[in-house]
Structure formats: structure tokens, C-alpha cells
């Protein structure tokens, strides 16, 4: 019988993580469970840094960005002896179950713990929206608002100077954030990890835009595809138009979560407790067509793929 659970946030922070923690804690307390908050993700689990939470521990945090429990990247957690110490730390506090909030790297940690006999449930928290098994991840919509606001501001100055602006957006290997922001921000050109890209083809498209009378342009590009500073110099040389690159960076992770992220995080936090009390373990939470679902973590990591939104890309190209 489950009496105590732990909750942690891991990897890159995302707006709405606090709301998810709150959802876990208050749902668990309503089911007569005790909840330990674990500081700084898997690192804190290994270092035995935990605190017993009550309903007041999560008061007034639903509107706060970041994660009050802290987060960290801890690659040593992939070592079995490190995980054994983490499990021992939880067992010493009579913790029966662990809820992990984070991205696919955090999912791997939860999967490894479950395989070692310590049951876990994972909640998707990442602005990249790159986790399989869910339409949206916690933090994505807030980051999207941040990116679009930045694009709007860049457009003001780009139009004033008849400049080409390149804006680099987070997302790793997933272009969802870039694509959505490009549509909402009216970007003229989009470069995504899912679509083959050459700088020559991009310049050709930009020149075609100039021939049509475009005085300025915004190019939205997902991080890690290329060096955007070098790309800006290349475009400027080939088009004879002033070109500047802006890397939005970690500002995309900050700020108060928007309404949808607060609701999504609250629902996922509640649902995680619901399914662990039903006896499920080694599962990850998702939302499909606004309905809460759960999948096997291993299946989500190895077999499930996020479908690329080709219809959204078509929309974006039609509106260039």
C-alpha cells in the first residue's frame, strides 16, 4: 500500500513545473499520502536532499516560473551504483513511489529506476515539446508566447532599418516551437531540423522575396542547425542586405506560466497520482486531444515518434 511518494524536477526548467508539483502534492494529500520534495532533481536524490511537503509548501506557486525544488543535469545518474544510493535514500524515508517532471532525459532516469524495482511515473516538462506520447509538454505554450513577443519586437526594428533578422529558437531536434512561433509571428522564412536545409536555398528564397518588394524579413531557425552568426554574414554578403542574428537563449525558459500551461500542469500532476494509486508504474503522462493518457516509458522513448506537422509548415509557406 502506497503511503509516501517523492516528487522531483529534472533537466531544463520549464514554466509550469511549479504548478505540476502543486498538482502532485495537493492531490496526494487529498488521498492521505505524504509527499517528499526532492531538491535539484536526480542530483538531490543521490545526495539525499529531501523535504516533507504540506499544502502550504505549494501555496502561491502556481503562477511562478522555474521550479522551487530546483533542477540539475546529473549524468552520473546513468551509473547503476549511483542509482542504488538514490533508491536507498528513498527507502530510508519509506518513500514508495517517485514522480519525475522533466524531458526525455528525465524519462530515462525514471525508466532506469523502475527497472531496478523502484516504481516511477513521469510528467513531460520541457519547452521543446519534443517528448513522445503527448500533444503538448508543460512549458511549451509559455515559451511560445515569449518567442513570439521577441519576434514582434525584432520586426519593429527590422522594418525600420530594412534589415533581415535571424532569430534562433530552442527545441533541439524538434521544430515545434520554431514552427508555431514563425506562424504566429509572421516570419518570412523557417529553418527546421525536420526539413533538409541549405544556406544556398535559403538565400534564393530571400532574394525572391526581395524581388517581390520585401523590405525586411525574419528568418526563424531552430538551434543547433548551424552557426547563426556565420549564416547572417553569408546572407548579408549574398543579398547586400544588412543581416543580424539574435539568439534568444534561456530567456525562453523563464517567466510566469501562461494559463494553458498552468491548467495542463495541474491536470497532469493530479493524473500522475491517480494512476500510481491504480497500480501503474513505469509510465509517462500525456495529453492527446485534451484527454489525459499514459504510456509505457520505454515505449515512449524507443518506439513512439512525434509526428511532424507538415500541414502547419504548408500554412507557413503559403503565408510567406
Swiss-Prot record:
It holds the Pfam family PFK. Its main location: cytoplasm. It is found in: Cytoplasm. GO terms for cellular component: 6-phosphofructokinase complex. Mg(2+) binds at residue 104. ADP binds at residues 22-26, 55-60, 155, 186-188, 212, 214-216. Its cofactor is Mg(2+). Catalyzes the phosphorylation of D-fructose 6-phosphate to fructose 1,6-bisphosphate by ATP, the first committing step of glycolysis. Homotetramer. Belongs to the phosphofructokinase type A (PFKA) family. ATP-dependent PFK group I subfamily. Prokaryotic clade 'B1' sub-subfamily. HAMAP family: Phosphofructokinase_I_B1. This is ATP-dependent 6-phosphofructokinase. The gene is pfkA.
